[in-house]
Amino acid sequence: MSRLQNDTFLRALLRQPTDYTPLWMMRQAGRYLPEYCETRRRAGSFLDLCKSPALACEVTLQPLARYDLDAAILFSDILTVPDAMGLGLYFAEGEGPRFERPLRDEWEIRNLVAPDPHAELQYVMDAVAEIRRALGGSVPLIGFSGSPWTLACYMVEGGSSDDYRRIKTMAYTRPDLLHHVLRVTADSVVAYLNAQIESGAQAVMVFDSWGGVLSEAAYREFSLPYLERVVAGLIRERDGERIPSIVFTKGGGLWLESIAAIGCDAVGLDWTMDIGRARALVGDKVALQGNLDPAILFAPPETIATEAKRVLDAFGPHPGHVFNLGHGISQFTPPEAVSVLVDTVHQHSRKLRGGR
């Protein structure tokens, strides 16, 4: 593998000094880019796009061709793992992801087993390897997975949900069943992320997208311990290089200090928490990633620049900040807005550190 030409992102995750604040965006390869939409059209379906290593590589690289981003992230979907468990993932027009066989009966739950990522998910590993080769050492590649709780939400609900009625009912009436789902899913996530690392991922991120729908007590029972189980099982070093881990709970500001204590290298923040206050709470224990409101990218260029500087100034010129949005970029974002954001973050963060 080629030696990294730009390791700013990895050094920031490890809280090492950097000349500027590195930046990447959740969903940076996505529908706001016309070239992505063209590749998606050629693929035929979203799942076909995910399952083609060549096309997944193509769309992963598209935002890097447009913008001076400091990391690439594997193009895939968090629901590949439950799909590999046999739940039958499909995408209904206008409804988003659905499962043909959601977990509703106890016998289905007791029969749930972790898939072999080198068998059922080999197409993801092939994509990781192909992307690493195509990057040629330009920037690091991030692998990712959904969190056990977030995956379980989809697996039990059968798709997206407004009220999480089925999984919360299970949590409060049959917690033993839910814990079984979470244990199997956590072990699946560990194996999946480690396989990505073995295939070439240089950092990994766990998306706990629905952790914020839980109460304080429920989060500490059904999400946090399984995030800790995942982090504890990850490969920490490969080929003499550290493999940093990022954990992101959307709506998880309440539990920031607890998340920072599970052993991950960085904690992702959504836009609802001041990043300066977050840094004061966690100190130098972990790096922080975030946390611009994605909706700011609909604003005029001067507003985008002002708000990006606000985030950078709040964190300050300290090591350990990766700039990102507080959630995924909207499909309606004007591509030129991202150019303003990237240029502002790189230029202003250099000035904060006394550079030009």
UniProtKB/Swiss-Prot annotation:
The record marks D77 as: Transition state stabilizer. Its main location: cytoplasm. Its EC number is 4.1.1.37. It catalyses: uroporphyrinogen III + 4 H(+) = coproporphyrinogen III + 4 CO2. GO terms for cellular component: cytosol. GO terms for biological process: protoporphyrinogen IX biosynthetic process from glutamate. Substrate binds at R27, Q28, A29, G30, R31, D77, Y154, S209, H327. InterPro entries: UROD/MetE-like_sf, Uroporphyrinogen_deCO2ase_HemE, Uroporphyrinogen_deCOase. The keyword Transcription regulation does not apply. Keywords: Cytoplasm, Decarboxylase, Lyase, Porphyrin biosynthesis. It is an enzyme of class 4 (lyase). CDD domains: URO-D. Catalyzes the decarboxylation of four acetate groups of uroporphyrinogen-III to yield coproporphyrinogen-III. This is Uroporphyrinogen decarboxylase. It comes from Aromatoleum aromaticum (strain DSM 19018 / LMG 30748 / EbN1) (Azoarcus sp. (strain EbN1)). The gene is hemE.
